[in-house]
C-alpha cells in the first residue's frame, strides 16, 4: 500500500467557498506541506494541474531540494506538451531528483479551459491524442537507455528520429498514472498506463470500475495497478470528525454552490458528472444528505471540482474504510485535507499506525532516536502510547 498527500497549488483554507481562513499559496507554505509529507513517511505527493493551479512542473522542481524521499506525481498534458519535450522534462526531473518522478497523464475535461489553452478537440479525439502522446512518450524514454531513436506517424501526433540523450534514473520510464471514467478512458488505461486512478466513489462503484479496466487490460495481455483520490477528515472521535466536516462547509451559501455546480455541469467529463451526481446539486447539506456510503462524504464536491468526496471518522473507522478499498484492489491512496499542512500531520499520526503498510523512516537520514515529544517536568521523556 502506498499513501500519497497533496500539494495545494490551487489554494488552501480552513473553509470551502470563502476567503475566510484562506492561506497565501507561497513557496514557503508549499515547501512546508512537502516537508511535512516527506518527514511523516508519505510515499509521494500529487501536484494538481489546470489554470486554477500554479504550474506543477515548476512547483515540483522547486521542492526537490527540500525533500529527501518524497516522490512527485506530476501532470503531462497532451495538447499542451509535445511528447518529445515532455520526455526530456521527465528524464531531467527524474535525474535531478534521484528517481522520484511519477507521471499523471491528464486528458482534461473542462472545455473552456482547454479552448483557452488552444485545445479544440472533442472528447473522443482528446483520448485518441492522449493515447498517441503517451505511446510516443514511453517509447522515447524507454529507448533512451540504449540510445535508440523513435519514429511515429499518428492521426494527431507524429515524430521522426525522436531521441533522448539523457535517460531517467527509473527504467524503462517513470510510472504513468491516469484517471478517467468514460469507456474511452478505460480503454486508454487498459492499453497504455501503469496505474489507473479513480476519484472516491462508493466501494461498489469503484469495484465496477476496477473490474472493467482489468477486463479491458487482459485483452492486451496487461495488468494495471489501481489508485484512488480522496479527501480525509479524521479526528480522535467520530463526533469530532463529523463536526469538522460540517465546519468545512459552514461558510458556504446557496449562490456559491449554485455557481460552482453550473460551472461543473458545463464540463465534458464523465468523472465530474459522476461526482456531481453524488450530492444531487447540494440543495441539502446535512450529513444525511451528503454521507453517500458509510463514512464517505460528498460535501467537498459542492464547490470543488475533481475529487469531491472525503472519508470522515475516527482513526479506526477511516483505516477500516481504507482497507475496504484496498480489498477491492486499490494499492495507491492519494489523500488531502483542509488545511493541508495540519492535516498531513494529523492523518499520519492517527491513521498510519493502523494501516497494513511498511512505513519508511519518518526522519530520513537524521539518525535521531526516540521517544519524541516535549520533556515532562524538565526530567522525564514522554512514554510511548501502548494503544
Swiss-Prot record:
The keyword Oxidoreductase applies. Keywords: Flavoprotein, FMN, Monooxygenase, Oxidoreductase. SUPFAM superfamilies: Bacterial luciferase-like. GO terms for molecular function: alkanesulfonate monooxygenase activity. Gene3D superfamilies: Luciferase-like domain. One of its GO terms (biological process) is alkanesulfonate catabolic process. It catalyses: an alkanesulfonate + FMNH2 + O2 = an aldehyde + FMN + sulfite + H2O + 2 H(+). InterPro entries: Alkanesulphonate_mOase_FMN-dep, Luciferase-like_dom, Luciferase-like_sf, SsuD_RutA_monooxygenase. Its EC number is 1.14.14.5. The keyword Magnesium does not apply. It is an enzyme of class 1 (oxidoreductase). HAMAP family: Alkanesulf_monooxygen. Belongs to the SsuD family. This is Alkanesulfonate monooxygenase. It comes from Polaromonas naphthalenivorans (strain CJ2).
Amino acid at each position: 500500500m502506498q499513501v500519497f498527500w497533496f500539494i495545494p497549488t490551487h489554494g488552501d483554507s480552513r473553509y470551502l467557498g470563502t476567503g475566510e481562513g484562506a492561506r497565501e499559496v507561497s513557496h514557503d507554505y508549499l515547501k512546508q506541506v512537502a516537508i511535512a509529507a516527506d518527514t511523516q513517511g508519505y510515499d509521494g505527493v500529487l501536484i494538481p494541474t489546470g489554470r486554477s493551479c500554479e504550474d506543477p512542473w515548476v512547483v515540483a522542481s522547486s521542492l526537490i531540494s527540500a525533500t529527501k524521499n518524497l516522490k512527485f506525481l506530476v501532470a503531462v498534458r497532451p495538447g499542451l506538451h509535445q511528447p518529445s519535450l515532455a520526455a526530456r522534462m521527465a528524464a531531467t526531473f527524474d535525474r535531478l531528483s534521484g528517481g522520484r518522478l511519477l507521471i499523471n497523464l491528464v486528458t482534461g475535461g473542462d472545455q473552456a479551459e482547454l479552448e483557452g489553452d488552444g485545445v479544440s478537440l472533442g472528447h473522443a479525439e482528446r483520448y485518441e491524442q492522449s493515447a498517441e502522446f503517451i505511446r510516443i512518450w514511453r517509447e522515447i524514454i524507454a529507448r533512451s537507455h540504449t540510445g535508440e531513436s523513435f519514429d511515429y506517424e499518428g492521426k494527431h501526433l507524429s515524430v521522426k528520429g525522436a531521441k533522448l540523450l539523457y535517460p531517467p534514473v527509473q527504467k524503462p520510464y517513470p510510472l504513468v498514472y491516469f484517471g478517467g471514467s468514460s469507456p474511452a478512458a478505460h480503454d486508454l488505461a487498459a492499453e497504455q498506463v501503469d496505474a489507473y486512478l479513480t476519484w472516491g466513489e462508493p466501494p461498489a462503484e469503484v469495484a465496477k470500475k476496477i473490474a472493467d479496466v482489468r477486463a479491458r487490460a487482459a485483452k492486451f495481455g496487461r495488468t494495471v495497478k489501481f489508485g484512488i483520490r480522496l479527501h480525509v477528515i479524521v479526528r480522535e472521535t467520530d463526533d469530532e470528525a463529523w463536526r469538522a466536516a460540517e465546519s468545512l462547509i459552514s461558510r458556504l451559501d446557496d449562490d456559491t454552490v449554485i455557481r460552482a455546480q453550473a460551472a461543473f455541469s458545463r464540463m465534458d467529463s464523465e468523472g465530474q458528472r459522476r461526482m456531481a451526481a453524488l450530492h444531487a446539486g447540494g440543495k441539502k447539506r446535512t450529513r444525511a444528505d451528503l454521507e453517500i456510503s458509510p463514512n464517505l462524504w460528498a460535501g467537498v464536491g459542492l464547490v470543488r471540482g475533481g475529487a469531491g468526496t472525503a472519508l470522515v471518522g475516527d482513526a479506526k473507522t477511516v483505516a477500516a474504510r481504507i482497507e475496504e478499498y484496498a480489498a477491492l484492489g486499490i494499492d495507491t491512496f492519494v489523500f488531502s485535507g483542509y488545511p493541508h499542512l495540519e492535516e498531513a500531520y494529523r492523518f499520519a499520526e492517527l491513521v498510519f499506525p493502523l494501516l497494513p503498510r511498511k512505513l519508511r523512516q519518518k526522519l530520513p537520514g537524521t539518525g535521531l532516536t526516540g521517544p519524541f515529544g516535549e520533556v515532562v517536568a524538565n526530567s522525564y521523556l514522554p512514554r510511548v502510547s501502548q494503544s
